[in-house]
Amino acid sequence: MNRSHHQHRYAHRLRTSAAAGISLLEVVVSIAVLSLLLSLVAPAILSMRDRSQALECRNRLRQLGVAAQERLATTGKFPKTSIPGQFDTTAGNASVAYISTSPFRELIASLDSNTADMIFQNEGDWGRDLAATLGHPFPPHDLGKQKIPVLICPSETQPQARLSYRANLGSAPSVHRSGMSQQDRLHSVGAFSNGFAITPAQFKDGMSNTVLFSERISGDFDANRYSPFRDSFRGQGNMMQVDAAMEICKTQAVVTPDHPDSEAGKDWLLGGWLSSWYNHVAGPNSTVPDCASLHDFGGGDALLSARSLHAGFVNAGFADGSVKSVADEIAIDVWRAMGTREAIDSQSE
């Protein structure tokens, strides 16, 4: 009797266990449902991350604007993009009139006091080293390669990047005004000017209408590959006029262009088109690749556009300290007007 009873209970457990088990079909269905949910949720998570990074990118650009306003309150001028050259004829060295530097050199005291101390302790040696290299500025101790978080947009994916923001040198390709058309001369007057510190009175269009800094992603840091959106190259021909610069950079951007440079953003202390300057010749995130006439030097003519990894826009900091997102689809005449401190009617172009 007891044995029969135990056998009955055992058989009941087996039937219950079989009924409670999961079939192969149920496993497949469950995996399919989970995959579907993941495919729906993952883009939302990525989108949230992208928005968060873009917001922090704006915040860091705003900090740069605050630092520029502090500099303005202290000196009455915005930072320079170059310092006087050093003249040393005793050793037969050639001299340079200006040494291209980043405006962040003068803002760093408000952003990172420790790095600022290092810069100004070595100022004398730095100037002599710069002059000796004839416009190839490489500060000692790799100061410009010090990683300062506020200078790097969180969206940047290259670990070597040290600078995600650049100074607006105007809406014309050249930093020199001789030989330009009248319209291009007006466009060349950016928030920053090579060799001069700009005062508020020089913003004829108003500081709230002129971009001070904008984003520019780094190069791909791969010397064996040319990435048109990230990298730049040396353009062949006269690039002083806007239309000519657009045509040269567009047509000469072949698979292996002349002197491609993949190290944009490697240093926040250097000046020049390859390091910390940009212009409004082409629109934000332009499909026209960047190029410059004097690719190894700070000055010369260039098309160097604002570029970001955000979907459809770049962040721009204005001279009054405000920060705005500017869509890729902005009319080019409006974008160029935002790049100059001259009072230009964007509808007249």
Stretches with model-predicted labels:
Residues 1-22, 88-89:
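N-terminal leader/signal peptides at the extreme start of proteins
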Residues 3, 9, 15, 32, ...:
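Intrinsically disordered, low-complexity segments enriched in polar/charged residues with Gly/Pro
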Residues 12, 22, 32, 36, ...:
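Intrinsic-disorder/low-complexity peptide segments enriched for small residues
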Residues 18-56, 63-64:
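N-terminal single-pass transmembrane signal-anchor helix
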Residues 44-349:
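Internal low-complexity, small-residue/proline-rich segments
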